[in-house]
């Protein structure tokens, strides 16, 4: 492969990455804790887009904090795992070229 082809490949990768990022924005990852008493949803960019807390937790601050931390951590992990998968898929597509 010569260097003129490499530029075209890189441009193609940039375009594919932009398309994946745009699609990823619409992906929603939801995590729950406390048997569903706390639910958080993140978009693919890692932005918190929804938070639900059962009314019964409003009287128990400590439990709410624990459930909230658990749900948030699980949500962040799901977003990161999705990002890794997208990156590996993109690299796999590049290797095929």
Curated annotation (Swiss-Prot):
Pfam families: YbaB_DNA_bd. The keyword Mitochondrion does not apply. One of its GO terms (cellular component) is bacterial nucleoid. It comes from Helicobacter pylori (strain P12). Binds to DNA and alters its conformation. May be involved in regulation of gene expression, nucleoid organization and DNA protection. It is found in: Cytoplasm, Nucleoid. Homodimer. HAMAP family: DNA_YbaB_EbfC. Belongs to the YbaB/EbfC family. NCBIfam families: DNA_YbaB_EbfC. Keywords: Cytoplasm, DNA-binding. InterPro entries: YbaB-like_sf, YbaB/EbfC. One of its GO terms (molecular function) is DNA binding. The keyword Calcium does not apply. The lineage of its organism: Bacteria, Pseudomonadati, Campylobacterota, Epsilonproteobacteria, Campylobacterales. Its main location: cytoplasm. This is Nucleoid-associated protein HPP12_0031.
